[in-house]
């Protein structure tokens, strides 16, 4: 936050970021994000940071915010263990309290043990209320998601990428991220149009015999607007010193 405050107004075009997720890891740094005692404190802190990001963005700039949800503790596993008892490979949460036995609170008002906290949408709504334009919720689907030792719910395999803008009109290059039209759609578009359907009368201005002719290749789109479910495999963090490669 302090570094952001040193940047001038409307300095950058776009911000792509993934802040530390709530209650997931302890990076061992004083004042780190994600170690707040309540989800509300976490949301408020990120809202304050991204308010400064909005100031730094150009008037037609955008923010692409990657975030995932967290679960309230069930009282089992590493959630209930002291720092000394937790497996180092997990790098899981512990309170910034100097007490080595301090653990993450297992529940909060309105959130029961084992509940999904709902961090992504709470954060999105907080940003919208703070002045951002909430434009899209992109689902990042992970084909190689990590397995989970759970028996009472599906394994998590996606995260959210929220597209937010500073203004109602902003720079967005649709063509740059357009995707190919499905081959089956291309083949279907090559076919002649028949008048033996309930939609035939809707073909205004066309001669009846023209409805049976194959369509011109120039009329067939080869690209379509990018969809909001993206299947992207994650990368290994080995050799990079970072636990959340994307």
Model features per residue range: what roles?
Residues 1-246:
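Core catalytic lobe of class I
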């Amino acid at each position: 936050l302090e570094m952001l405050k040193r940047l001038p107004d409307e300095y950058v075009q776009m911000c792509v970021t993934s802040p530390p997720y709530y209650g997931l890891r302890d990076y061992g740094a004083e004042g780190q994000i994600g170690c707040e005692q309540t989800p509300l404190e976490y949301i408020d802190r990120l809202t304050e940071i991204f308010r400064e990001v909005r100031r730094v963005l150009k008037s037609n700039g955008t923010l692409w915010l990657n975030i995932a949800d967290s679960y309230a503790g069930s009282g089992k596993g590493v959630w209930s263990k002291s720092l000394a008892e937790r497996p180092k490979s997990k790098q899981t949460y512990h309170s910034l309290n100097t007490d080595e036995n301090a653990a993450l609170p297992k529940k909060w008002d309105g959130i029961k043990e084992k509940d999904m906290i709902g961090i992504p949408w709470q954060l999105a709504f907080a940003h919208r209320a703070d002045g951002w334009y909430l434009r899209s919720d992109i689902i990042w689907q992970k084909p190689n998601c990590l397995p989970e030792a759970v028996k009472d719910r599906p394994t998590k395999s996606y995260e959210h990428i929220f597209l937010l803008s500073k203004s109602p009109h902003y720079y967005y290059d649709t063509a740059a991220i357009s995707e190919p039209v499905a081959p089956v759609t291309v083949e279907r578009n090559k076919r002649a149009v028949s008048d033996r359907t309930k939609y035939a009368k809707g073909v205004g201005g066309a001669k009846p015999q023209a409805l049976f002719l194959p369509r011109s290749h120039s009329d067939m789109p080869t690209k379509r607007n990018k969809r909001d479910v993206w299947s992207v495999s994650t990368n290994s963090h080995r050799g990079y010193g970072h636990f959340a490669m994307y």
